[in-house]
Amino acid sequence: MSEVLFREAVTRGNTRMKIATIETFDLTCPLNRPFGWSQGWIDQRGTTLVKITTDNGLAGWGEGAESSIINHLLGPLLIGANPMDRAGLWEHMFHALYNGNNAVGLAGSALSALDIALWDLAGKAANLPICTLLGGKIRDKVAVYATGLYYTEGEFPDRLLDEARSYVEQGFTGMKTKVGGLSIEEDVARVKALRDAIGPDVSLMIDANEGYNATTAIRIGKKLQDLDLVWFEEPVNAQDLEAYLEVKAALPMAIAGGENLRTRYEFKPYLARRAYDIVQPDIMHCGGLTEMARICALANACGIQVNPHVWGSPVMIAATLHLTATLPPCPPARNAQPYLQEPVMEFDRTPSAIRDEVCAVPFDQVDSFAKVPQGAGLGIEIDEEAVRRMS
């Protein structure tokens, strides 16, 4: 979209509005069947939503994982400001965290939540979808893969393999499972059974959630290398750059990571040294739409594909779809394909009332593609009754 058209759009609306209130909602929902991965076991899901309301009644929604930093540090910085000044407000919030290197961890997630809400507000003020504000779409729908196949009690083999087959029946062309929560022998048997169940034509990925050191990651990777795995995600500690380089040099499948990094400054050495084949920034942790767009540009310049990490409510799903719709193929290709040049987005299928009930119309996929929302801002309708019920 041209700058002239954007200015015309916002001039028709609410360019002089000010931020009046900021509310946070810490959401939780129980799980009927607990599940786990290499780092934990949960019996409930949770996230934090933020609602920014202006003096003219317009509201924008964001998502992160921390309410106290929003309520007591970053939120007060925004009261009275014009939400259209997104870049300046991002820098203002980042500067408040900069001196102590506090833009990592939960503070980075708080910054992300507020930034997403500001983009939602800007889109609603201009009556334009966020992807248009970002420069316009390259694609109307985004390729997605099913995330599920976690560890559950008594899952193997029947329940696990039935779950995998159900994703194929739903039209998914790819899916991801966990490793690192069992012995190497047990995890290898689990992944081999999954490959046999879904056949050779469905993309299969594994995710260790930082569960190994480099030596062990290489060991299990070599045991699985004949299964045509598309990628091995977070094989080692997210902060161990040298371990990533060691694993990447030793294994034939692509190495993926980045969901636990914050801001372009943490991503920079991993991208510059090509520690990843695939980078997976998380929009509700890495700095929101503003910062994730910068990270994606860095990755593309380094020839590293961006396949975003997504595990939250419809707010982060919508935000990620809008940004992913604008990402160029990596590298450019006449007939770009998912997994090869086109970005592929995570599509969480684990149980979550938050994901399924917070939005009036939950997101779905058809033939392993999810449509980019067309409405103003995030393009979704939040069910505030459901939000308040779960908070």
Region spans (language model):
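Extended hydrophobic packing segments that form well-structured cores
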Residues: 373-391
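N-terminal amphipathic/basic-hydrophobic helices that include classical n-h-c signal peptides
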Residues: 1-16
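Conserved, mostly hydrophobic/aromatic
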Residues: 19, 57, 74, 114, ...
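Structured beta-strand/loop patches that form or line metal/cofactor-binding pockets in enzymes
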Residues: 14-59, 351-356
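Metal-dependent enolase-superfamily TIM-barrel catalytic cores that perform enediolate-based chemistry
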Residues: 135, 140-251
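Glycine- and other small-residue-rich loops at beta-strand/loop junctions that grip anionic moieties
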Residues: 63, 111, 179-183, 209-210, ...
